[in-house]
């Protein structure tokens, strides 16, 4: 795995690449195009594989839930944009993606994967890296899975909501926090309000 330039609390590495957009068109996009919004950037190993379509379809199907909280979801792999489009145009029953509601970025030169530190160099593919970037472009969360295990859309959505809550209210979110549940005031005395209710 490459070391990369992606660090929690620092600006996420910007990139420019060709993506297949939800309307099926090719477009050059940059991460900086999304400033002012949260971004979930997730990498997957390859098109036309087995775990990947389950993740991509799950994120695409729930993309509106992310948009409602000012967050965009972007998928990326080392495949060409032509390969992405062919996969999108392949029926789901044949292992394809079908219609997409999120852009899929092409990283054929592996520049983005290297910059984000998730390139599996011996195979030239990406690990399952997932990055949550806030509305100022700061990297807030990194998860990297080995190839055989997919990621949870529910957990990703929860994490975005938690970071947005802490940004807005200045309180912190305990383990397993869900929107609407109790948070903790980051103060020795005031935190006791939370702990006295949760033994």
From Swiss-Prot:
One Pfam match: 1-cysPrx_C
UniProt source species: Gekko japonicus
Residues annotated as transmembrane: none
Protein's GO biological process: cell redox homeostasis; hydrogen peroxide catabolic process; leukocyte activation; removal of superoxide radicals
InterPro entries attached to this UniProt entry: AhpC/TSA, Peroxiredoxin, Peroxiredoxin_AhpC-typ, Peroxiredoxin_C, Thioredoxin-like_sf, Thioredoxin_domain
Modification after translation (UniProt): The enzyme can be inactivated by further oxidation of the cysteine sulfenic acid (C(P)-SOH) to sulphinic acid (C(P)-SO2H) instead of its condensation to a disulfide bond. It can be reactivated by forming a transient disulfide bond with sulfiredoxin SRXN1, which reduces the cysteine sulfinic acid in an ATP- and Mg-dependent manner.
Chief site of localization: cytoplasm
GO molecular function: thioredoxin peroxidase activity
General function of this protein: Thiol-specific peroxidase that catalyzes the reduction of hydrogen peroxide and organic hydroperoxides to water and alcohols, respectively. Plays a role in cell protection against oxidative stress by detoxifying peroxides and as sensor of hydrogen peroxide-mediated signaling events. Might participate in the signaling cascades of growth factors and tumor necrosis factor-alpha by regulating the intracellular concentrations of H(2)O(2). Reduces an intramolecular disulfide bond in GDPD5 that gates the ability to GDPD5 to drive postmitotic motor neuron differentiation.
Domain of life assignment: Eukaryota
GO cellular component: cytosol
Subunit relationships: Homodimer; disulfide-linked, upon oxidation. 5 homodimers assemble to form a ring-like decamer. Interacts with GDPD5; forms a mixed-disulfide with GDPD5. Interacts with SESN1 and SESN2. Interacts with FAM107A.
Entry keyword set: Antioxidant, Cytoplasm, Disulfide bond, Oxidoreductase, Peroxidase, Redox-active center
Subcellular location: Cytoplasm
Entry protein name: Peroxiredoxin-1
Thioredoxin domain mapped to chain residues: 6-165
Reaction catalyzed: a hydroperoxide + [thioredoxin]-dithiol = an alcohol + [thioredoxin]-disulfide + H2O
EC number of this enzyme: 1.11.1.24
